[in-house]
Curated annotation (Swiss-Prot):
Disulfide bridge partners, by residue number: none
Locations listed in the record: Plastid, Chloroplast
Predominant subcellular localization, coarse grouping: plastid
Pfam families: Ribosomal_L20 (PF00453)
Species annotation: Arabis hirsuta
Protein's recorded name: Large ribosomal subunit protein bL20c
InterPro entries xrefs: Ribosomal_bL20, RIBOSOMAL_L20_CS, Ribosomal_protein_bL20_C
Length: 117
């Protein structure tokens, strides 16, 4: 059989890996085997937390809305507010409502007056 010369393929792969892991601490940025393990862990965490970020922001918006609703006495509860929004077919999502609640309370009052039964 003929000999296969691989050239610098392995070095290229390790260099690419080293660039990815250059910000890691200790042996995780120096040793190839631990670099590969940490890279896998980092990518798994990034993938998992992209989904978690969406849930966290939704929770934040709901918490902000609930706080403003209780503080101002616009409604008795958050879920009655959302329920009435859907009944009146107002297409405002939680993100927009939270922004309105923080920055423009008078607009929130007009929305609540619009949807009150």
């Amino acid at each position: 059989m003929t000999r296969i010369k691989r050239g610098y393929i392995a070095r290229r792969r390790r260099t690419k890996l080293r660039l990815f892991a250059s910000s890691f601490r200790g042996a995780h940025s120096r040793l190839t085997r631990t670099m590969t393990q940490q890279r896998i862990r980092a990518l798994v965490s990034a993938h998992r937390d992209r989904g978690k970020r969406k849930r966290d922001f939704r929770r934040l918006w709901i918490t902000r809305l609930n706080a403003v609703i209780h503080e101002t006495g616009v409604f008795h509860s958050y879920n009655r507010f959302i329920h009435n929004l859907y009944k009146k077919q107002l297409l405002l999502n939680r993100k927009i409502l939270a922004q309105i609640a923080l920055l423009n309370r008078s607009c929130l009052y007009t929305i609540s007056n619009e949807i009150k039964e």
